[in-house]
Amino acid sequence: MENNNIMSQVKEIIEAAIKELEDDGFEPDIILAGPIFIRYLPEDVRLKVYEIEELGSDAIIADSKYLGQIKKAAKRISIDPLLQEKEWEKIIEEIPTQE
């Protein structure tokens, strides 16, 4: 269930990045993603996914026609802060409380 929650948040992050790119006139069609990011990638993502080991928990959403030519044609996102937050929530839950 926790993975589903993370996956839904990742989907929201991806959709926001896609919208930003589309608002700037681009047509995002690829995701370059690290292996950690891919673990939480929803199956219904409509972009072609390429795994790049070095990206870790990050991903780059881009319009492949302009990637490397125009900086605004790509958006890098990271789920590392989200994963760290979930880890801290687990730690806090395990702390015994005094009653």
Swiss-Prot record:
It is found in: Encapsulin nanocompartment. One of its GO terms (cellular component) is encapsulin nanocompartment. Its main location: other. Keywords: Encapsulin nanocompartment. Gene3D superfamilies: hypothetical protein PF0899 domain. It comes from the Archaea. It holds the Pfam family ENCP4. May self-assemble into facets and potentially into larger complexes. May be the encapsulin shell protein in a type 4 A-domain encapsulin nanocompartment system. Its cargo may be upstream glyceraldehyde-3-phosphate dehydrogenase (AC P61879). Belongs to the encapsulin family. Family 4B subfamily. NCBIfam families: encap_f4b. This is Putative type 4B encapsulin shell protein PF1875. It comes from Pyrococcus furiosus (strain ATCC 43587 / DSM 3638 / JCM 8422 / Vc1).
